[in-house]
A protein has these predicted regions:
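Bacterial N-terminal signal peptides that target proteins for export
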Residues: 2-15
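Bacterial N-terminal signal peptides
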Residues: 14-24
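A structural "domain/chain start" motif
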Residues: 26-110, 217, 221-229
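Sequence contexts marking disulfide-bonded cysteines in secreted/extracellular proteins
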Residues: 27, 70, 147-149, 156-158, ...
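Solvent-exposed loop/turn segments at secondary-structure junctions
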Residues: 55-59, 89-91, 136-141, 189-192
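Surface-exposed short loop/turn segments
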Residues: 103-177
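Short secondary-structure boundary motifs at beta->alpha junctions and helix caps
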Residues: 152-221
Length: 229
């Protein structure tokens, strides 16, 4: 079962110091695709989730702060999940979840747990779901210019700049209990940030990565379900 939704996030900011009025709005739009392989499962309060980033090499890694953001979002609120921090998990499982050795599909987990030490560690963590996230946030276009100078009477910056950011991420959810693919989620977030400067630069930022994180976490939560207390 698959679904798609669009989330528009817009922040309006009053810009002083003669900045044009149309600079008072910057925002982002998020498109979410959701594919569910299995029905929503309610975890027991003892079961845990680990969120991991795919690491491909220099310049292609999923950002560590994005993985932390998704994990933090999942572990907050009245329906908080038990989330194992990525670094803690990877370090404790060394070297089985490093870049060159991490399992690439759920079938490889079955082979991995044939190792008694790995099986024992998984049981200790009470792992139920692995969430693998692949993707990144990039600046795709820049416009405008800005110059700053310092003189005897003081200094300042003048000009205008804008840039477009795109965040593209895909999450694959593995159900460790059933050794099956639970579902996939993809998010695409786009936004434009502005920086007018009349003496002082005023950044008006579109929270592209932050909005992508929240949308991703919401959809992961909807697939995994609510812990049973």
């Amino acid at each position: 079962m698959s679904s798609r939704k669009v989330v528009v996030s817009k922040a309006r900011v009053a810009v002083l110091l003669t900045a044009p009025l149309w600079l008072g709005a910057c925002g982002s739009t998020t498109v979410v695709d959701d594919y569910r392989e299995t029905p929503v499962t309610n975890l027991s309060h003892e079961e845990a989730v680990v969120v991991l980033g795919r690491r491909h090499g220099a310049g292609q890694d999923t950002e560590i702060d994005f993985i932390s953001c998704v994990g933090n979002e999942l572990s907050q609120g009245s329906s908080a999940l038990a989330v194992i921090p990525e670094k803690l998990f990877v370090d404790s499982m060394y070297p089985y979840f490093e870049t060159s050795t991490a399992p690439m599909d759920v079938k490889n987990l079955d082979r991995l747990i044939q190792n008694p030490a790995i099986a024992e560690k998984f049981a200790e963590y009470r792992l139920r779901f692995f969430v693998w996230i692949d993707g990144s946030t990039e600046t795709v276009d820049k416009k405008g210019s800005m110059s700053c100078a310092i003189g005897p009477g003081g200094g300042g910056c003048f000009g205008f700049a804008s840039w477009d950011d795109e965040a593209n991420y895909e999450a694959t959810i593995w159900d460790f209990k059933n050794l099956a693919l639970a579902g996939k989620i993809s998010t695409e977030t786009k936004g434009t940030s502005y920086m007018p400067a009349v003496l002082i630069p005023i950044p008006l930022l579109a929270r592209v990565q932050s909005n992508a994180c929240k949308s991703m976490a919401d959809q992961i939560h909807s697939q995994i379900g609510t812990p049973l207390r």
